[in-house]
Swiss-Prot record:
GO molecular function: DNA binding; promoter-specific chromatin binding; zinc ion binding
Residue(s) of cross-link: Glycyl lysine isopeptide (Lys-Gly) (interchain with G-Cter in SUMO2): K51, K88
Keywords, alphabetical: Disease variant, DNA-binding, Intellectual disability, Isopeptide bond, Metal-binding, Nucleus, Phosphoprotein, Repressor, Transcription, Transcription regulation, Ubl conjugation, Zinc, Zinc-finger
Protein name, as recorded: Polycomb group RING finger protein 2
Region (Disordered): 240-344
Modifications the protein undergoes after translation, according to the UniProt entry: Phosphorylated. Homodimer formation is regulated by phosphorylation with only unphosphorylated proteins forming homodimers.
Oligomer and partners: Exists as both a monomer and homodimer. Component of a PRC1-like complex. Interacts with CBX8, RING1 and RNF2. Interacts with CBX7. Interacts with PHC2.
Gene3D superfamilies: Phosphatidylinositol 3-kinase Catalytic Subunit, Chain A, domain 1, Zinc/RING finger domain, C3HC4 (zinc finger)
Gene from which the chain derives: PCGF2
Length: 344
């Protein structure tokens, strides 16, 4: 599963702090020539006596340097959201200042300049703030289309919506909310509880503060969330193939080699007198003991053929037999005294 890496706010401080005062940006203002940002009061006071950027020495407007700076609302919103309590403390300082100096005129007369903007209106949240949310079962687009008919006819008031309302800290994660729903509804472990915002599934590591910042929720009502229950996906386990050990033949030996390994070697076979009659000694029931020799004598099977017969009896193949040696080819053999031509 993909996991995010959380970083500390101190690692982002070089991008969120003013180089002139050493504090976090307040009314962040950017120089258009080099895009370096500073606090508004800091850069205005600096450009009264200097015509260069404090960080890179890029020259700004020679005669009217204030024309080269712009207010950066996006950067200021990022600073307020990343630094806990910064917006709340800044609004309190402004209210205290104008309370101590009531005759001071506020430029442009904005509520934020007077410190009269609340955190709820700005959209900033703190970790310990309580967030109101609504949770209901996710029906899907098809079910919503099917229920449009009864709602248009006025029968939707009779149907219970099943919406539940909760008050949770802003630092609570989606994983904790899913565990709460699982325990509340006694969902078996083989099913997965998934939390959604509209039709988009939420990451388990998202906090309610992250959802409020990522999605267009303006805090004009409870945070609308949905949930659904799905079967948990099982991970596929691949069959492990045994690793061939050293000295083991894994190259796919041929059938001839496998048969020859199982069959006994011709050199180790005993004498074939038990299975074949000896050329010099007639066997019981042979033609020489009871009658004249056969008209068409048959030559005895050589040792290699005998071993082949034994191999065939054991389920082997005759095509894998070794060729008789040269000594067996030149040997003269007789059957019952009759010469037999040498084998070729």
């Amino acid at each position: 599963m993909h996991r995010t890496t959380r970083i500390k706010i101190t690692e982002l401080n070089p991008h969120l702090m003013c180089a002139l005062c050493g504090g976090y940006f307040i009314d962040a203002t950017t120089i258009v020539e080099c895009l370096h940002s500073f606090c508004k009061t800091c850069i205005v006071r600096y450009l009264e006596t200097n015509k260069y950027c404090p960080m890179c020495d890029v020259q700004v407007h020679k005669t009217r340097p204030l024309l080269s700076i712009r207010s950066d609302k996006t950067l200021q919103d990022i600073v307020y959201k990343l630094v806990p309590g910064l917006f709340k403390d800044e609004m309190k300082r402004r209210r205290d200042f104008y309370a101590a100096y009531p005759l001071t005129e506020v430029p442009n007369g904005s509520n934020e300049d007077r410190g009269e903007v609340l955190e709820q209106e700005k959209g900033a949240l703190s970790d310990d703030e309580i967030v109101s949310l609504s949770i209901e079962f996710y029906e899907g687009a098809r079910d919503r289309d099917e229920k449009k008919g009864p709602l248009e006819n006025g029968d939707g008031d009779k149907e219970k919506t099943g919406v539940r309302f909760l008050r949770c800290p802003a630092a609570m994660t989606v994983m904790h909310l899913a565990k709460f729903l699982r325990n509340k509804m006694d969902v078996p472990s083989k099913y997965k509880v998934e939390v959604l915002y509209e039709d988009e599934p939420l990451k388990e590591y998202y906090t309610l503060m992250d959802i409020a910042y990522i999605y267009p929720w303006r805090r004009n009502g409870p945070l609308p969330l949905k949930y659904r229950v799905q079967p948990a996906c099982k991970r596929l386990t691949l069959a492990t193939v045994p690793t061939p050990s050293e000295g083991t033949n894994t190259s796919g030996a041929s059938e001839c080699e496998s048969v020859s390994d199982k069959a006994p070697s011709p050199a180790t076979l005993p004498a074939t007198s038990s299975s074949l009659p000896s050329p010099a000694t007639p066997s019981h029931g042979s033609p020489s003991s009871h009658g004249p020799p056969a008209t068409h004598p048959t030559s005895p099977t050589p040792p290699s053929t005998a071993s082949g017969a034994t191999t065939a009896a054991n389920g082997g193949s005759l095509n894998c037999l070794q060729t008789p040696s040269s000594t067996s080819r030149g040997r003269k053999m007789t059957v019952n005294g009759a010469p037999v031509p040498p084998l070729t």
